[in-house]
A protein has these predicted regions:
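A structural signal for multi-pass alpha-helical bundles of membrane permease subunits
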Residues: 1-214
Length: 214
């Protein structure tokens, strides 16, 4: 039904509508703001899910292979950003990237890199990547927990046999862990892709007001 409506000039009242076929789509792709938004979304989709899942896998492997009593604590700490309201996450990172009071610029100025300090969210070349960093930080813990659950289902005897054969952590991860949980990785990647599309708009509104300098 939604697609059929898109082929008409129907308004919210739905009065006197008629078919215009692909005219709405032609208008949409002639809109420079739509094209810019589409490009930015595609950039985020190409970067955020891959980095998020990669970091989540590494953290999950480290925690699942450790014998630390604090494993539960680490899970909670890394998962915590995912339970915070996305608006709050955006506000927190807006302060991190703030041009005068931000942690990032304060650090750069503190170590003498004054030329690197800038208005991160006010610059079109960096605002998108600030949003990407925020998305990665917010979602990594969620996928880490999912991967830990999958890794904990792998028999410890397989790892013990690999240790006897002289395999190190990296070899174990690439030869044992990743192949055995590849189905879960596929699922989490699709979820990360969907999450990037759904959450990027909210973060861009909160952090930049819809674009650099609002």
């Amino acid at each position: 039904r939604a697609f059929l409506l898109s082929l008409t000039n129907a308004t919210s009242l739905g009065l006197n509508s008629k078919f215009v076929f692909l005219e709405n789509y032609k208008y949409m792709f002639r809109d420079e703001y739509f094209i810019l938004a589409l490009k930015n979304t595609l950039k985020l989709m190409a970067v955020v899910p891959i980095i998020t899942i990669a970091i989540a896998l590494v953290l999950a492997f480290i925690i699942s292979q450790s014998d630390l009593k604090e494993r539960g604590l680490y899970r909670t700490v890394f998962y915590f950003p995912n339970i915070i309201s996305l608006t709050v996450v955006g506000i927190i990172w807006s302060f991190v990237f703030h041009p005068t009071m931000g942690i990032l610029n304060s650090f750069l100025n503190g170590v003498g890199l004054h030329g690197w300090a800038k208005s991160w969210l006010g610059d079109g070349s960096t605002a998108l990547w600030c949003i990407a960093v925020t998305l990665i930080w917010q979602a990594t813990g969620y996928y880490m927990v999912m991967h830990i659950a999958a890794m904990d289902g792998i028999s410890s005897e397989i790892y013990e046999a690999a240790t006897i054969d002289g395999a190190g952590p990296v070899r174990k991860m690439f030869s044992i862990t990743l192949p055995l949980i590849k189905d879960i990785i596929g699922i989490t990647f699709v979820l990360a892709l969907s999450g990037t599309i759904n959450l990027s708009f909210t973060l861009s509104k909160v952090m930049t007001g819809g674009g650099p300098n609002g």
